[in-house]
Amino acid sequence: FQELGIETVISPHTNKTLMDAGSHYAIDENCLSSKLFFGHVSALEGKCDAVFVPRIANYGKDGVMCSRFEGLYDMAVNTFRDHDIDFVTCNVDIQQKCPEEQAYIMLGVSLGASEAKAREAYQKSYQAWQAAQKAHIAEEEARLHDDRIKILVVGHSYNLYDEYIGKPILKGIEQLDAVPICSDAVDLKQAQEDSLNICKSVPWIMSRELLGSIAKYHNDVDGIILLTAFPCGPDSMINEMIIRRIKDR
């Protein structure tokens, strides 16, 4: 958005007030992360012209996303239909021949940019993400050389780094004079391949990335914490399988 000259407004860090607001708008069956999402949307009301909520269906037949990611935009639009909030979205659905780059270019064009400018903005953003991810992986791998107890914390990035539900766990490990290693410090394509060493039939791409991180790090750490946002459906199945297949390795 910044490359397109559009000002960005970021919701505040998660806190109890925001979580309570999200619980108010979400149904009980939603996972905690979904409830926090609705809380963040409500916090942006009146503070921006529109809230960006991508609709991410899949990254191909072997890249299925949790159904919440596909439905977030529609749920948000309907939940806040009587509020002063507008939404913009893009559809990432490789099975329907709409890859991520095309989806974001179409979004940029819908916001008034030329196709060339939208493509340039996407490519610069993707390159910046790649550089940041490479630096993050190098930082976490360097922590493996620490002589203290090392704990691999396995969870989705939106949970791991949330100030209210994930960061306290990472800080708690550090306060115990141990070293937390975050599971997202992996090359995502390599992690998906490595996940096959644990299970070959997991449909969700993000779950396979978690499995791949365990395959990469489990021999170099002293313990593993599985961080799950209750009642996440995919995680509830994957975690049990992880425990059974990793505990004796």
What are these regions (language model features)?
Residues 2-249:
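An N-terminal assembly and electron-transfer interface module characteristic of large anaerobic redox
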